[in-house]
């Protein structure tokens, strides 16, 4: 079934306008792939024979964001705001001397030439807008394109099962959309077979843009596909080149892998292709680091971490995802055997290592703080039952405490599966109102000055002592707070 979203309608209007002006135009790339998979595209891309100047002249609201590469954004106005469609001119690329961008591009009128410069066959499909308007038409094949392939069942067919019920990596391709496909590279067959295959010679595709190696892993994990053998071999051979890619681009790819709901498979593939030891050597070193079986019957630190990643839900918070990945990153360097396997100080070491990883990938200060807080506090749940009331309440004050709860639960489920500590903390956290966790201070520095104290560094300790007593429930009024401070810190 075709989407009914504003984005889709806007893309069709762009296509119709380009066609009416005498240009070729197709839905292309990820949106074509997702439509064939029965998924709702996040955005829509149009490939066209129209030059950027022609696109700019044809539409009243445009943004030439990538004119050097033939990319123009076309905005369609609605009362609720603008909907943007990316329009790219058919092109062929010159050499990629920087491993990221082509040194030169040449506009072309050939859709096939444009497709063959792209990364993977599943991203090299075009949808014909004229046939989208008459979905009952029979299948058609463009000159030089591959004919349609036999499909698997779709909604309404005998034997159909939704994606969540599929036990294998093959996928359904909607029959009505199948009739609109222009396929020069065998992308439909690879969609049906569940294969991520580079277009043409994989070593050339990855030499052009090294980030494509990570993208291939991400697509395979996202769709439950396999990397085609030649594509996987090329990634292994070229994996060290990923270090030439900007850390921000690598970070963004890794974050998508962690937050799309298929993190375990993504990191297994990163390991299998040799990319993991290049981008995250600290995580790669988890392999083979044993753990005490009485606490970790699941196996080594790597297996434990994979089991955490498997529990990350689609759309999970970025700090939680990275916290899950890095929570035990300090274990390999602190491994020792003294009667049993021990990791003394692994939390402190892990925080330092996590800080370096966040710096390397240029996380924001806020992101770094949240990720490191998860690493630093993930072992504290075991002590919660022995905490003083003031300590427990301060524990609950941690930013995004729900993420700390989520990480601890995943940690338990990836090990002994004992949720006693998690239940203890969760029950008390949910039962404790915010005003109890963060009560209004009974006394401030202004009152201390009024009482005769000289401002200085000692104020922090005094106010902390009063707050501790307040959180413990031993004092409840400003007068009691001042009396406690006067008793403990007499005015000299």
Model feature map: region roles:
Residues 1-492:
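Catalytic cores of the polymerase beta-like nucleotidyltransferase superfamily
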